[in-house]
From Swiss-Prot:
Molecular function GO labels: O-methyltransferase activity; protein dimerization activity; S-adenosylmethionine-dependent methyltransferase activity
Enzyme class: transferase
Name this polypeptide is given: O-methyltransferase ZRP4
Provenance organism: Zea mays
Keywords associated with the record: Methyltransferase, S-adenosyl-L-methionine, Transferase
């Protein structure tokens, strides 16, 4: 016999607690994902043709013998969060039937690593690294107090993020690879969804372009476009050498090499209003007038643009608070528009074809 609370106040209390628990324990979803990446469970299932029982997964992942029985519990979280699926087993009682785990569109993004065009494991590994996660414990205090440094990341680690990437090679690789994996996926979609953005230009400089994943994708799709990357010297030092893309060490706050178009992907949301204006003023000096094809191509969120379902809205809101850790922000159209006009641009066009993100073409 099923017992349930017999008064609606009790039921509402339980519902409220459940809702609260969902948010309180949401970090366990992230930690389960982090474990799955660490154990390379997606690869193990992939090696079994996309569907594998627990014992087949166990034959491919390295587990301490005492932890074997816990893997099923981890898989239960990963299936309820849609990272993996399960195949119903025909016959046998529930107790003795072994579930078969399958890849979902989500876990297909976890197969392989840098070698795979779509692999998103490096970005997840970056976001879930303690260096990035730990500053958020200070978020409440940051709202209340004048901290010695207004940047939560700097407050926690004693250095800004780009100073830390300079000093810590492991963290630098984590950031470079993480962002490169995102660039590979999103720039590929941008090229397919909005090829006209890259047509009609003969040169492009990717400012803050990291190790060049976006520039390489553009150069491959549009071989007539001469692509270069401007980034800090310690990042450029790690860039690939056998590529058509030219890497230039420099500081975007000082000067930007000339090109028909400047790409800024996941860069401006790292900076406050005034810094964005400074960067865009330098971009304007680097490009020809609008009539000659000059433009800045931004890939970032435009809060409120794109699909308006709850998942997209929630992700934009979460990302805006996430990027607070380095004093960055996600912006709505009005906020972007103010930056563009202060930096001396005449017009812009938002192309909301990248899910939670958009392409913005900005014209001098
Ligand atoms: C969030 S990452 C984006 C990387 C790349 N655009 C992507 O999305 O894959 C920001 C990049 O800006 C670079 N950066 C930071 N300060 C810079 C500066 N003053 N001049 C040039 N690049 C800078 C960082 O080294 C880093 O590669």
């Amino acid at each position: 016999m099923e017992l349930s609370p017999n008064n609606s106040t009790d039921q509402s209390l339980l519902d409220a607690q459940l809702e609260l628990w969902h948010t309180t324990f949401a970090f366990m979803k992230s930690m389960a994902l982090k474990s799955a990446i660490h154990l390379r469970i997606a690869d193990a299932i992939h090696l079994h043709g996309g569907a594998a029982s627990l014992s087949q997964i166990l034959s491919k992942v390295h587990l301490h013998p005492s932890r074997v029985s816990s893997l099923r519990r981890l898989m239960r979280v990963l299936t309820t969060t849609n990272v993996f699926g399960t195949q119903p087993l025909g016959g046998g009682s529930d107790d003795d039937s072994e579930p078969v785990y399958t890849l979902t569109p989500v876990s297909r993004l976890l197969i392989g690593s840098q070698s795979s065009q779509l692999a998103q494991t490096p970005l997840a590994a970056m976001v879930l690294d303690p260096t990035i996660v730990s500053p958020f414990s200070e978020l409440g205090a940051w709202f209340q107090h004048e901290l010695p440094d207004p940047c939560i990341f700097k407050h926690t680690h004693g250095r800004g993020i780009w100073e830390l990437t300079k000093d810590d090679a492991t963290f630098d690789a984590l950031v470079n690879d993480g962002l490169a994996s995102d660039s590979q996926l999103i720039v590929d979609v941008a090229i397919k969804q909005s090829a006209e953005v890259f047509q009609g230009i003969s040169s492009l400089v990717d400012v803050g372009g990291g190790i060049g994943a976006a520039a390489q994708a553009i150069s491959k799709a549009f071989p007539h476009v001469k692509c270069s990357v401007l980034d800090l010297a310690h990042v450029v030092a790690k860039a690939p050498t056998h590529t058509d893309v030219q890497f230039i060490a420099g500081d975007m706050f000082e000067s930007i090499p000339p090109a028909d178009a400047v790409l800024l992907k996941s860069v401006l949301h790292d900076w406050d209003h005034d810094d964005c204006v400074k960067i865009l003023k330098n971009c304007k000096k680097a490009i020809p007038p609008r009539e000659a094809g000059g433009k800045v191509i931004i890939i970032n969120m435009v809060v409120g643009a794109g699909p308006s379902d709850m998942k997209h809205k929630e992700m934009q809101a979460i990302f805006d608070v996430y990027i607070m850790f380095i004093n960055g922000m996600e912006r709505d159209e009005q906020e972007w528009s103010k930056i563009f006009s202060e930096a001396g641009y005449s017009d812009y066009r938002i192309i909301p074809v990248l899910g939670v993100r958009s392409i913005i073409e900005v014209y001098p």
